[in-house]
């Protein structure tokens, strides 16, 4: 398995903590050179990069100029994992509805598009590549006010991935979506009381959330599969059962 991916470059956006960190560790374990992208939190990103023998690169992926510079610096990217997101709970009181919409869409959708676009160009030239986009259970659920822009961005990501799948297929490039449910990250643990967490898990048929490592393992399995493209794969313990 290490030989299969040895020397390939994997770029993980939002790679400094939580699921992003687990993804970086999983691809490094497979022999990849790992690029840990981050917007904020240099120390955390550098710690992950040091742990996996990779490189931490700061980039606001909502800026096309910044994304282009990042890809110029990194060189050929074989595997892109679009994991970065704007946290729906980080909205500040002074932000207008329009400003918040732009902030969420800028990272969660535009950023995924820009990174996918620049990655795909090189992948097509080398006739091999993997695009994986991390979505959410919220892409399927009727959103409340807090989650409206987040849910819309994640749902649109599904169409974006199918477009990339169509464009990349003649060149051996695949594009898929992984839509996890509840992931038991440190952020989730700090935000939910034990009672709230128990209530969340009670609504999941399998009765639990997933660990970041469990999701990262499954993400790697998707990337390994060269005959899978244009698909949306759910990993949520039965919280949403696709028809």
Located regions from the model:
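Conserved glycine-rich cofactor-binding loop
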Residues: 9, 16-17
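The beta1-alpha1 cofactor-binding region of Rossmann-like NAD(H)/NADP(H)-dependent oxidoreductases
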Residues: 42, 58-69, 98, 213
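Conserved mid-core segment of classical short-chain dehydrogenase/reductases
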Residues: 85-102, 145-149, 189-192
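Catalytic Tyr-X3-Lys loop
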Residues: 86, 97-114, 128, 132, ...
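Catalytic loop of short-chain dehydrogenase/reductase
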Residues: 87, 132-156, 161-170, 182
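Amphipathic alpha-helical dimer-interface segment in Rossmann-like NAD(P)H-dependent oxidoreductases
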Residues: 107-128, 165-166, 170, 220
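C-terminal substrate-recognition "lid" of short-chain dehydrogenase/reductases
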Residues: 128, 211-235, 240
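Short, flexible catalytic-loop segment of classical short-chain dehydrogenase/reductase
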Residues: 140, 179-190
């Amino acid at each position: 398995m290490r030989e299969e991916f040895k020397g390939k470059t994997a770029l993980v956006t939002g790679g400094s903590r939580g699921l992003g960190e687990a993804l970086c560790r999983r691809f490094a374990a497979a022999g990849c050179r790992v690029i840990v992208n981050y917007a904020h939190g240099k120390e955390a990103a550098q710690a992950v990069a040091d742990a996996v023998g990779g490189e931490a690169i700061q980039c606001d992926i909502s800026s096309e100029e910044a994304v282009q510079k990042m890809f110029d610096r990194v060189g050929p990217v074989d595997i892109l994992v679009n994991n970065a997101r704007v946290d729906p709970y980080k909205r500040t009181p002074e932000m207008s509805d329009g400003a918040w919409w732009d902030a969420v869409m800028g990272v969660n959708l535009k950023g995924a598009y820009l990174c996918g676009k620049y990655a795909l160009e090189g992948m097509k030239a080398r006739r091999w590549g993997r695009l994986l986009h991390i979505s959410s259970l919220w892409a399927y659920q009727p959103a409340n006010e807090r989650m409206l822009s987040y849910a819309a961005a994640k749902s649109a990501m599904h169409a974006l991935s199918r477009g990339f799948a169509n464009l990349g297929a003649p060149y051996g490039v695949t594009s898929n979506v992984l839509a996890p449910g509840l992931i038991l990250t440190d952020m989730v643990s700090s935000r939910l009381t034990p009672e709230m967490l128990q209530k969340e898990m009670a609504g999941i048929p399998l009765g639990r959330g997933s660990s970041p490592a469990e999701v990262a393992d499954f993400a790697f399995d998707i990337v390994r599969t060269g005959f899978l493209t244009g698909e949306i794969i759910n990993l949520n313990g039965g919280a949403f059962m696709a028809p």
